[in-house]
Curated annotation (Swiss-Prot):
Active site positions: 65, 137
Catalytic activity: Endonucleolytic cleavage to 5'-phosphomonoester
InterPro entries linked to this entry: dsRBD_dom (IPR014720), RNase_III (IPR011907), RNase_III_dom (IPR000999), RNase_III_sf (IPR036389)
Keyword terms: Cytoplasm, Endonuclease, Hydrolase, Magnesium, Metal-binding, mRNA processing, Nuclease, RNA-binding, rRNA processing, rRNA-binding, tRNA processing
Organism: Corynebacterium jeikeium (strain K411)
Listed GO MF terms: double-stranded RNA binding; metal ion binding; ribonuclease III activity; rRNA binding
Gene assigned in the entry: rnc
GO CC annotation, single: cytoplasm
Obligatory cofactor(s): Mg(2+)
Family the UniProt entry places it in: Belongs to the ribonuclease III family.
Primary localization: cytoplasm
A Pfam family matched in the record: Ribonucleas_3_3
Residues binding Mg(2+): 61, 134, 137
Protein name (Swiss-Prot/TrEMBL): Ribonuclease 3
Length: 244
């Protein structure tokens, strides 16, 4: 008997997308989307590349990232009128970082719907922070294209309401050392090493921290060792995000 031929291209995409009932997902998001746009929002580059370099959801992610950032920034501006710009910026980081987005994605059950390549599936891609976070942004991009900014904004405020309310705490005290450890675990990289030195008189010391992860070296400074280490860890996370 001849072996069944593996589907590729649009046929593979339609077959994979058709395996799921997307009504529960759209209900969780509280919106409707046409199949072609929803299918694109759920198509990870690993699936697209394995099936003839199909279009993937990265352009929608780009759009959704902008929508999310503006919606959250405006809400923080209105909800916390007494806060300085520097505080609002940190608060926004606490709401829209990869781990916060991944948390929202898990709550919505996104992992069960993302179309992944075989390699990503085998390495637990449907529960990776980065993939889940990207899927939230691509969905927001799709919602914006189909419904406009007001619906997209309302969706953001509904899904992120708790995180926005908690932003004065989570955003201003973000544990960058923990975030870095989670990032390294996702990327299968070794643990970081920290070196800290202090300069200046005892009553007014400045601490300088260095984080090393293989060939990546980042630096931070502050008036305590903890602040310096967290500043260096934050720089490391940002550099790793650029590489991802």
């Amino acid at each position: 008997m001849a072996r069944k031929r593996r589907l590729t291209g649009e046929a593979a995409l339609n077959a994979a997308y058709g395996k799921s009932d997307h009504a529960p997902l759209l209900e969780a998001w509280g919106v409707d989307l046409p199949d072609d746009l929803l299918r694109l929002a759920l198509t990870h580059r690993s699936f697209a590349n394995e099936n003839g370099h199909l279009p993937n959801n990265e352009r929608l992610e780009f759009l959704g990232d902008a929508v999310l950032g503006l919606a959250v920034a405006e809400q923080l501006y209105r909800q916390f009128p007494e806060r300085a710009e520097s505080d609002i910026s940190k608060m926004r980081s606490g709401v829209v970082n990869m781990y916060a987005l991944a948390d929202v994605a898990r709550r919505l059950g996104m992992g069960d719907y993302i179309l992944l390549g075989r390699g990503e599936m085998l390495t637990g891609g449907k529960d990776k922070h980065s993939i889940l976070a990207d899927s939230v942004e691509s969905m927001l991009g799709a919602i914006y294209l189909h419904h406009g900014f007001e619906v997209a904004r309302a969706t953001v405020l509904r899904l992120f309401a708790e995180k926005i309310t908690e932003a004065p705490t989570t955003g201003l005290t973000m544990d960058w050392k923990t975030v870095l450890l989670e990032k390294l675990s996702d990327m299968k990289l070794p643990l970081p090493t920290y070196e800290v030195r202090g300069e200046g008189p005892e009553h007014d010391k400045t601490f300088y921290a260095t984080v090393t992860i293989e060939d990546l070296v980042t630096h931070g400074e502050g008036h305590t060792k903890k602040v310096a280490e967290h500043a260096a860890a934050k720089q490391a996370v940002q550099k790793l995000n650029e590489r991802a």
